[in-house]
């Protein structure tokens, strides 16, 4: 896993953004958060982001998480995206992965599990990039 991975959190809940950002920063990751899909997509276009944590229900955006995921794929088809939701179930998790997410985490989430999934996603992304380069 490469150093200096920048993680983007897109969630309309300020407390969740701060909690996740703090957790990631404590584990040595750099993170930014945006409260709307539109702001998150703009940042993704202008900055090198290694992974996106994306809420499914973005109440203050034009797009929900699934629509935002599709737009992320138009910007970067390979970036790992982990969907997060407080209203999730197995169907939501499966739907997230079918639509191109790397993984799914349900709120409230266990911090250790979230960090594990982030590390795994970044490791797999790095391996995939190495295979493409070689």
Regions found by a protein language model. Give the residues of each.
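Active-site beta3 strand of CheY-like receiver
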Residues: 47-58
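His-Asp phosphorelay/catalytic-motif detector in bacterial-type signaling
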Residues: 4, 48-50, 74-80
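Short amphipathic alpha-helix used as the core "switch/output" element in two-component signaling
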Residues: 42, 64-78, 95
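Two-component/phosphorelay signaling modules centered on CheY-like receiver
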Residues: 2, 14-32, 38
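Flexible nucleotide-interacting loop at or near the entrance of a catalytic core
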Residues: 113-134
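C-terminal output helix
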Residues: 89-91, 105-118
């Amino acid at each position: 896993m490469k150093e200096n991975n920048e993680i983007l959190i897109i969630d309309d809940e300020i407390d969740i953004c701060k909690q996740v950002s703090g957790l990631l920063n404590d584990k040595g990751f750099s993170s930014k958060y945006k409260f709307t899909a539109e702001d998150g997509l703009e940042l993704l276009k202008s900055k090198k982001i290694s992974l996106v944590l994306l809420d499914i229900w973005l109440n203050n955006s034009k797009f929900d998480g699934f629509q935002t995921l599709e737009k992320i794929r138009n910007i970067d088809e390979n970036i790992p995206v982990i969907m997060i939701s407080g209203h999730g179930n197995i169907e939501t998790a499966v739907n997230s992965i079918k639509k191109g997410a790397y993984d799914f985490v349900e709120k409230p989430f266990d911090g250790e599990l979230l960090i594990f999934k982030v590390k795994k996603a970044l490791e797999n992304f790095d391996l995939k990039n190495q295979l493409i380069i070689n």
